[in-house]
Design a protein with these regions (language model features):
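Class II aminoacyl-tRNA synthetase catalytic cores and aaRS-like
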Residues: 1-504
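Compact, charge-rich alpha-helical regulatory domains located at protein termini
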Residues: 500-576
C-alpha cells in the first residue's frame, strides 16, 4: 500500500510494527494462546472472601491509562470487558523494563490483541480487575478504531452512520454495545426452531440452490450461466417444490433453513438474499399448521426474550397463542368497506379505481386483490393475525377450500404490519396443479414477470401420489427483527446487500505521465487533491509545486519535485 494512502495514525502504527520486529517481538505469533476465563465469568464469580485466583485471558485493548510505573487498560473479549492493572515491576520483574517502558507504553495501540496472565483483585475504587503478571502481544492492529466514549449515560463520537455500520460490520461489532447481542439472539432463534422441529421428528434436508426452473413462489429470479452444461440456471426463489418431492418420496416431515434469492427491490424490510425456513408435514392441513405455528413462535419468543412478548418500535407484541384468524376478503371488507366475494376481474378493477390504486393490464384478479390488501390492510395488523382463505388466483400451489368455492386453504401470518409466514394445505392433485401452472403461464404472456413457470418434473412427482400435506415458509430475517425489536432488516443481517461504495473519480497514472509527469509524482498529486488531469487547470504552477513539496517533506519521500517551469508547460498541455 502506498504510504500516501495512509493516515498519520496508520503510518505510526506501521512504524510501531517495525519497532516491535527490531525488538524481536512477533506481532502475529503462530502459537496457540490457551485461555481459561472470560471477562463476564470473572466479574460474576469474584468474591472478596475467596482464595486468590489466577486467570489467563485474551482480548482487544480498548483503552489505556498510563500513570508512570502503573497503568490500567480495558480488555474486550468475546463476552464483554474487564479492567487490567499493569504494573511495570510485575510484568518486568528483572532489570530489563523494555516490555513496559517501550512495548506497553509506546508500541502497543488501541485495538491490539493481547494476552494477560494474572490474579483477580478489587481495586481501591472497588472495580474488579486482573493484576497482570505476564503480557503477550497476540495481534497488531494497523487501523485505528472509532473511539466511542460514554459518560453519565451519554455516548460521544459514536460509530452510528448506518451505511458505514453495515459496510464495516466488523467495526460495528467491536465498538457498538448491543450489536453482537442481536446476532446471538438470531442464533437462539435458529437453534430453538431446529430443536422444536427435530423434537417433532422432522428431518432437516438440503435442496439445490442452483435450479433449472425458478419455482415455488411468484418472484423475479437471479439468473446465471452454468458453463459445464451450457444452460441458464436460476438462484432459487423458494425451496418448496423440492421439499414436496421428498414428501412424495416418503418423508413424514422435512424442513430446510437456507438462503433464497429474489431479484427485486431493497428496502427496510426486504433484502434480495434472505433466509427462510420451509416445513412440509404429511397428513396435516392448514388448520393444524396454524396451531403448530403459534406454538413454535411462542416458544421461540420465550427462548429469546424470556417471555411471550417483544417490544418493537414502542409496540408490545404478544406471541402467546392463540392468534386471531381472519379471511382475506373479510379483512378487505373490514378495512375498505368493499365486499369482493364473488366479484370477477373487471369488477375488482373498478374497485381498484375507486380506491385510486395504480394498476396495469398485466395484473390478474389475484394480483389486484393483493394490491388492495397490501395498500389498505396489511399494515394495520400489529398483533399476530392469520389472514386466511385466499382466492385461487393468488395461490397456484394451494389446495381448493373444502367448503368455500373459489378460495384456497392458505394463510399468511401478519405481525407488526408485515407478512411473517405463508402456509397452505398443499395442492396434491396433479391435474389441478397442471391447470394452475397453465393459468400462471397466461399471466406471464401478459407481461407478469413474477408468474410461475411450469415445472414438469414436479408434476411428474405429483403423479406418483403425494399424501395430504401442509407446508409453511417463515422469513427468518423478519422473525429476528420482531424478536429483537428492530425496524430495519439490515440491522439483523451481518452483511446486508449494499450499493457499491462511492469512489472519487481518478484518472489513470498513464494520463498524467502523458503530460510529462513522472509516475512516482502522481500519488503525490492525488494526495494534494489533483485526482483528474483537468483538476490541474484549476491551480497555478507555483502553488502546485508548493503543495507537492509539502507532501514530500511531510512523508519524507525520496523523490524530486518538478520545477515551476515544468509544471507551467504541463498546465499549457492541460488547457489545450
Amino acid at each position: 500500500m502506498n504510504i500516501l494512502e495512509l493516515s498519520e495514525q496508520e503510518i505510526q502504527r506501521r512504524a510501531n510494527l517495525e519497532s516491535l520486529k527490531e525488538l524481536g517481538i512477533a506481532a502475529y505469533p503462530a502459537a496457540e494462546y490457551p485461555t481459561d476465563a472470560f471477562s463476564t465469568e470473572i466479574l460474576e464469580s469474584f468474591s472478596d472472601d475467596a482464595p486468590q485466583r489466577t486467570v489467563v485471558i485474551a482480548g482487544r485493548m480498548m483503552s489505556r491509562r498510563v500513570m508512570g510505573k502503573a497503568s490500567f487498560m480495558e480488555l474486550q473479549d468475546s463476552k464483554g470487558r474487564i479492567q487490567v492493572y499493569v504494573n511495570r515491576d510485575a510484568i518486568c520483574p528483572g532489570e530489563d523494563k523494555t516490555l513496559y517502558n517501550n512495548v506497553f507504553k509506546k508500541l502497543l495501540d488501541l485495538g491490539d490483541f493481547v494476552g494477560v496472565k494474572g490474579f483477580v483483585f478489587r481495586t481501591q475504587t472497588g472495580e474488579i480487575s486482573v493484576h497482570a503478571e505476564e503480557l503477550t502481544l497476540l495481534s497488531k492492529s494497523l487501523k485505528p478504531l472509532p473511539v466511542v466514549k460514554e459518560k453519565d449515560g451519554q455516548v460521544f463520537d459514536s460509530f452510528e452512520d448506518p451505511e458505514l455500520r453495515y459496510r464495516q460490520r466488523y467495526v460495528d461489532l467491536i465498538v457498538n454495545k448491543g450489536v453482537k447481542d442481536i446476532f446471538l439472539k438470531r442464533a437462539t432463534v435458529l437453534r430453538t426452531m431446529r430443536q422444536i422441529l427435530d423434537e417433532n421428528g422432522y428431518t432437516e434436508v438440503e435442496t439445490p440452490t442452483l435450479q433449472s426452473i425458478a419455482g415455488g413462489a411468484t418472484a423475479r429470479p437471479f439468473t446465471t450461466h452454468f458453463n459445464a452444461l451450457n444452460i441458464e440456471m436460476y438462484m432459487r426463489i423458494a425451496t418448496e417444490l423440492y421439499l414436496k418431492r421428498l414428501i412424495v418420496g416418503g418423508f413424514e416431515g422435512v424442513y430446510e433453513i437456507g438462503k433464497n434469492f429474489r431479484n427485486e427491490g431493497m428496502d427496510r424490510t426486504h433484502n434480495p438474499e434472505f433466509t427462510c425456513m420451509e416445513l412440509y408435514v404429511q397428513y396435516k392441513d392448514y388448520n393444524w399448521m396454524m396451531t403448530f405455528t403459534e406454538q413454535l413462535l411462542e416458544k421461540i419468543c420465550i427462548a429469546v426474550n424470556g417471555s411471550t412478548e417483544s417490544v418493537v418500535d414502542g409496540q408490545t407484541i404478544s406471541f402467546k397463542a392463540p392468534y386471531r384468524r381472519l379471511p382475506i376478503l373479510e379483512a378487505i371488507k373490514e378495512k375498505t368497506g368493499f365486499d369482493l366475494e364473488g366479484k370477477d376481474e373487471a369488477e375488482i378493477r373498478e374497485v381498484c379505481k375507486k380506491l385510486e390504486l395504480e394498476i396495469d393490464d398485466t395484473m390478474g384478479k389475484g394480483k389486484l386483490i393483493d394490491e388492495i390488501f397490501g395498500e389498505f390492510c396489511e399494515g394495520s395488523f400489529i398483533q399476530p393475525t392469520f389472514i386466511t382463505d385466499y382466492p385461487v388466483e393468488m395461490s397456484p400451489l394451494t389446495k381448493m377450500h373444502r367448503s368455500k368455492p373459489g378460495l384456497t386453504e392458505r394463510f399468511e401470518l401478519m405481525v407488526n404490519g408485515k407478512e411473517l409466514a405463508n402456509a397452505y394445505s398443499e395442492l396434491n392433485d396433479p391435474i389441478d396443479q397442471e391447470e394452475r401452472f397453465v393459468e400462471q403461464m397466461k399471466l406471464a404472456d401478459k407481461g407478469d414477470d413474477e408468474a410461475m413457470i411450469i415445472d414438469h418434473d414436479f408434476l411428474r412427482a405429483l403423479q406418483y401420489g403425494m399424501p395430504p400435506t401442509s407446508g409453511i415458509g417463515i422469513g427468518i430475517d423478519r422473525l429476528v427483527m420482531l424478536m429483537t425489536g428492530h425496524m430495519t432488516i439490515q440491522e439483523v443481517l451481518l452483511f446486508p446487500q449494499m450499493k457499491p461504495e462511492k469512489k472519487i473519480p481518478k484518472d489513470s497514472v498513464e494520463k498524467f505521465v502523458e503530460l510529462g509527469l513522472s509516475a512516482e509524482i502522481v500519488p503525490v498529486l492525488n494526495k494534494c487533491g489533483y485526482n483528474l488531469v483537468s483538476d490541474l487547470a484549476k491551480s497555478k504552477a507555483q502553488k502546485i509545486q508548493q503543495q507537492i513539496g509539502e507532501v514530500i517533506k511531510k512523508y519524507k519521500l525520496e523523490i524530486e519535485k518538478p520545477s515551476v517551469a515544468e509544471l507551467e508547460e504541463i498546465l499549457l498541455k492541460v488547457e489545450s
